Structures are given as C-alpha cells and as structure tokens.
Design a protein with these regions (language model features):
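Surface-exposed molecular-recognition determinants
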Residues: 1-180
C-alpha cells in the first residue's frame, strides 16, 4: 500500500475546509489525514459531509449517511471508559457526520486522525468510510474515537467538506492521499 499525496489545505480561522477536485476514479480508496485541528470555539465536534456528482458546488447537505461510533477515553483525573456513542450515529440522515467528541480550544488542545473513503467514484455501490481520531476534550480528557458507516449514494462523490459544528477552524492541516 502506497499513499500518493494529492492536495493539502491549511486552516486559518476558516469556517470550512473542502476538497472540490482530486476525488475521482484514479484511486479506489482515498485517505484524509488531519493534523492538529484546533477549534476557535470550545467544546465542538469535528465533522464532514460530501457532495454527490449531481450536487457539485452545492451546500454539502443532501447526501444521506448511516454510521456507528465508539470511543475510549481517559480523563487527566485518572477516570477512563469505553462506550458506544449513539448520539453520534446517523441513520439515513443528511446531517454532517461527527468524527470526534467535544474538542477543546485551549492552546494545547486539538484533534488528529484519518478518514478513509472507499470507491467514491463508483456509480454502482454506496460509499463506505472509516475514521479514527484522537482528540483533546474540552474537560481535559483524551479520546480515541472510531466511526464507520456508509454514504447511501450510488452517484460518484467528487467533493468533501470538513468543519467544526460551531465556530471556525482556528488552525490545522488536512492532507488528501490516493491509496494504491
């Protein structure tokens, strides 16, 4: 498996970060690597949504997602746990899919991880995805967050957008790779 770098975007008080080109039939698998996504607002979820080929340039608000989320966490005060995160699941919803819990905006808090999107150019199958993130929570905990699901769309998916559910992305970089 080799990663071929396609594009990068860097936040600077950005409302969203999007890739509107580069996702096509060249690769069957695309990875998005997130480095220190730091929110301007405290206690916010980092999330994504896609545009199908019939809505390119649209509002990233029509593709239906179904997903499941699990997390492990550890507070600085020494409490820890493992849980299913039902509030982050989507069930045939056009909402943005959460990739993290509530990220803090202290100077040392951020979220980093990888989202993998499978066969986005397929016009036969729905689009599966997996994500794994580590984030620094607003109340001084670290979290290992796993999300998996599918985009219930048989049209190609050429665009993807990322944002925090409230406020701007203060800083951070997203790199898009094709997987060979």
């Amino acid at each position: 498996m080799a990663l071929i770098h396609i594009a990068s975007v860097t936040a600077s008080s950005s409302a969203t970060l999007s890739f509107t080109s580069g996702i096509d039939s060249t690769y069957n698998e695309y990875q998005f690597h997130f480095e220190n996504m730091h929110p301007a607002t405290d206690q916010v979820f980092f999330q994504f949504q896609v545009n199908a080929s019939d809505d390119t340039g649209g509002g990233f608000d029509t593709s239906v997602i179904t997903s499941s989320a699990f997390l492990a966490y550890h507070f600085e005060g020494d409490a820890s746990g493992l849980s299913y995160s039902g509030t982050q699941d989507l069930a045939q919803s056009a909402s943005h899919q959460r990739l993290t819990q509530e990220v803090g905006n202290n100077a040392d808090q951020s979220a980093s991880g990888i989202l993998t999107l499978y066969t986005p150019a397929s016009t036969t199958y729905t689009k599966n995805f997996t994500a794994r993130f580590a984030d620094s929570g607003y109340n001084d905990y670290v979290e290992d967050h796993h999300v998996a699901g599918y985009i219930n769309q048989t049209l190609a998916i050429p665009e993807i957008s990322f944002k925090f559910h409230s406020g701007n992305i203060d800083a951070g970089t997203i790199k898009m790779f094709g997987v060979t």
